[in-house]
């Protein structure tokens, strides 16, 4: 069996060709980011290899967007607990179906910790999914802004929610969620700013990271988990 050896010295078979290609693309992106922004480069060296692919989502469009709705304005820990309780309401399927969610009484959803506004958003999303949201395959051929324009027509789906879909499900590598608190906090910490950067300032940093803003965002999120040195 043919094998390939990466820079790291790890031996990989052709069965892992996709992973090899991904890691090589990561290497290209990392080299670019380190050259264009040495301060970010120091953070990259400290954190190590990009693991963005390990956080990618599964499931159809309804599942991914409903998950993002549940995560809105909550800490990752709290959102994860609520999402797991939500999934437990539908033990017969890996990914809840839109019709099943629509048929679930609001009070049942409230008991697993979902707020009433989010119940309204998820059920509106379910109605759109049943009546004809684009499939993930149809979204694949659309550009980022067209996808954002299409999906933000659904109540409760804002730009940030769609950007999470772009990064973690559609694998778009040049998305900068300028309204994301984690990204902004990461910028403030990394560049020793006095306050959280506003949208314009965040976009200014992003100009140095294009076309790999998603990769830069991942490192900024991870930076918040680091202990002070």
Q: What is the predicted function of each stretch?
A:
Residues 39-46, 74-153, 208-210:
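Alpha-helical ds-nucleic-acid-binding substructure associated with the helix-hairpin-helix region
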Residues 73-81, 130-134, 170-175, 223-229:
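Short helix-capping/linker segments at secondary-structure and domain boundaries
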Residues 2, 10-20:
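Acidic, Ala/Val/Gly-enriched low-complexity intrinsically disordered segments
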């Amino acid at each position: 069996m043919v094998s390939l050896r990466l820079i790291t010295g790890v031996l990989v078979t052709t069965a892992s060709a996709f992973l090899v290609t991904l890691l090589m693309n990561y290497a290209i992106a990392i080299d670019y980011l380190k050259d264009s922004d040495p301060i970010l480069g120091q953070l990259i060296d400290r954190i190590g290899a990009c693991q963005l692919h390990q956080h990618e989502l599964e499931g159809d469009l309804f599942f991914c967007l409903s998950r993002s709705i549940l995560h809105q304005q909550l800490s990752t820990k709290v959102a994860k607990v609520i999402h797991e309780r939500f999934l437990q309401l539908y033990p017969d399927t890996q990914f809840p179906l839109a019709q099943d969610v629509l048929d679930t009484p609001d009070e049942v959803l409230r008991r697993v910790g979902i707020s009433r506004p989010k119940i309204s958003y998820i059920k509106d999303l379910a109605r759109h999914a049943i009546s004809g949201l684009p499939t993930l395959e149809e979204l694949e051929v659309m550009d980022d802004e067209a996808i954002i324009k299409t999906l933000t027509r659904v109540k409760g789906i804002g730009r940030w929610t769609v950007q999470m879909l772009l990064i973690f499900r559609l694998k778009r590598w040049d998305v900068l969620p300028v309204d994301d608190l984690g990204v902004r906090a990461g910028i403030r910490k990394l560049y020793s700013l006095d306050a959280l950067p506003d949208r314009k300032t965040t976009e200014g940093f992003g100009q140095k990271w294009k076309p790999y803003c998603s990769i830069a965002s991942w490192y900024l999120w991870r930076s918040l988990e680091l202990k002070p040195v």
